[in-house]
C-alpha cells in the first residue's frame, strides 16, 4: 500500500524514532510502513492519520487491480 507517511513525518520535523514512540511501535515498523514493506493495522493507520490531522484515505492509498472494473 502506498502512503505519504514519510513526507508528513518529515514536514512535522519528526524522526522515525520519535514518531515511533508517539505511535507506540518500533522505529523498524515506521520504516517498513514508509517503504511499503508493511501495511499497518487499521488501528495504527487511524492513529497515524489522527496524528497528521488528515483523512486516512489521503495518507494511505490503496489500489487493487482486482477491484478495477473490467468492462
Predicted regions and their residues:
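Short basic helix-loop element that most often maps to the first helix and adjoining turn
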Residues: 3-22
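Residues in the helix-turn-helix
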Residues: 18, 29, 58
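Recognition helix of helix-turn-helix/homeodomain-like DNA-binding domains
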Residues: 25-38
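DNA major-groove recognition helix of helix-turn-helix/homeodomain DNA-binding modules
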Residues: 43-58
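Short, basic-rich loop-to-helix N-cap that marks the start of a DNA-contacting helix
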Residues: 37-47, 66
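Short, charged recognition helix plus adjacent turn
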Residues: 50, 60-71
Amino acid at each position: 500500500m502506498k502512503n505519504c507517511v514519510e513526507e508528513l513525518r518529515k514536514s512535522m520535523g519528526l524522526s522515525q524514532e520519535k514518531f515511533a514512540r508517539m505511535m507506540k511501535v518500533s522505529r523498524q515498523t515506521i520504516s517498513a510502513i514508509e517503504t511499503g514493506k508493511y501495511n499497518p493495522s487499521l488501528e495504527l493507520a487511524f492513529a497515524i492519520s489522527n496524528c497528521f490531522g488528515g483523512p486516512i484515505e489521503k495518507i494511505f492509498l490503496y489500489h487493487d487491480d482486482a477491484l478495477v472494473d473490467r468492462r
